[in-house]
């Protein structure tokens, strides 16, 4: 065994590694001690463990190095198991939108009656109707025949009531431990639908800086005012929105007339509109305005229906919510 130790020391010194020499020397000593105690198998196992420790450390350091080098190109959200599903259109092409999925798209019911009007009866109805008419006069004075900008401003405001109503019903449901009858979902769907109208209009109209400032101011004022309004009287608030949607239908009808008369160019429909409303590939602005007008008519009916429920002295949860009713 002494000869083994001498040969090991010589190999280590010739290999130029004093550090390796001590490692091999200590390993050989351990083997000798184990063999003397009759533990040959365990000694060989210990030799293997001792000899691979530096390699394990090197392997771990290499893995860490690779991880550091790879983090710059890695998607952070994948760490949490959140990855974008591979979604495709019906024709097999890749779905390009993150803001909505194919199952969120739909065919708008353009057969809806766009001429319906709720005749004001009660005091709250008349106040709501007059308030909307006053706002309509102001918007007509400012935008005149700039239908695209008018629609963009309208959608910025119209997307607020559904969010406010849905949020307050959500808080009420949590506070009173009660179901909403589906009305939270219905109102939030309305808000999302109005937002998609706006995203479509932004593809067609590029607002100027002063129009952006006006939208920013109007949205801030309207959100807070409608929040208080809904707290005080949901009945009047829904009636107000119903009349607001009636005016939206009128505005889009005027927009359609301008397209048909040639005052407004009938440009190709944006790609987002084609996918959201499942329009044909050759759809035009006229098709987009037509489906948006139909959506507004549906919102009109939903909000007048909600106000009627309150007028009967009932809560919204007592009537079926029009879920999926764009």
UniProtKB/Swiss-Prot annotation:
Reaction(s) the record says it catalyses: 2 a ubiquinol + O2 = 2 a ubiquinone + 2 H2O
Note on cofactor: Binds 2 iron ions per subunit.
Keyword annotations of the record: Disulfide bond, Electron transport, Iron, Membrane, Metal-binding, Mitochondrion, Mitochondrion inner membrane, Oxidoreductase, Respiratory chain, Transit peptide, Transmembrane, Transmembrane helix, Transport
Record field: transmembrane: 151-171, 213-233
Subcellular location: Mitochondrion inner membrane
Membrane topology: Multi-pass membrane protein
GO CC annotations on file: mitochondrial inner membrane; mitochondrion
The keyword Mitochondrion belongs to this UniProt entry's keyword annotation: yes
GO molecular function: alternative oxidase activity; metal ion binding; superoxide-generating NADPH oxidase activity; ubiquinol:oxygen oxidoreductase activity
CDD domains per UniProt: AOX
Residues given in the record as Fe cation 2 binding sites: 194, 245, 296, 299
EC numbers for this chain: 1.10.3.11
Cofactor(s) demanded: Fe cation
One of the GO BP terms on file: alternative respiration
Keyword Transit peptide part of the UniProt annotation: yes
The family this protein is said to belong to: Belongs to the alternative oxidase family.
Self-association and partners: Homodimer; disulfide-linked.
Known role: Catalyzes the cyanide-resistant oxidation of ubiquinol and the reduction of molecular oxygen to water, but does not translocate protons and consequently is not linked to oxidative phosphorylation. May increase respiration when the cytochrome respiratory pathway is restricted, or in response to low temperatures.
Listed name of the protein: Alternative oxidase 3, mitochondrial
Species whose genome carries this gene: Glycine max
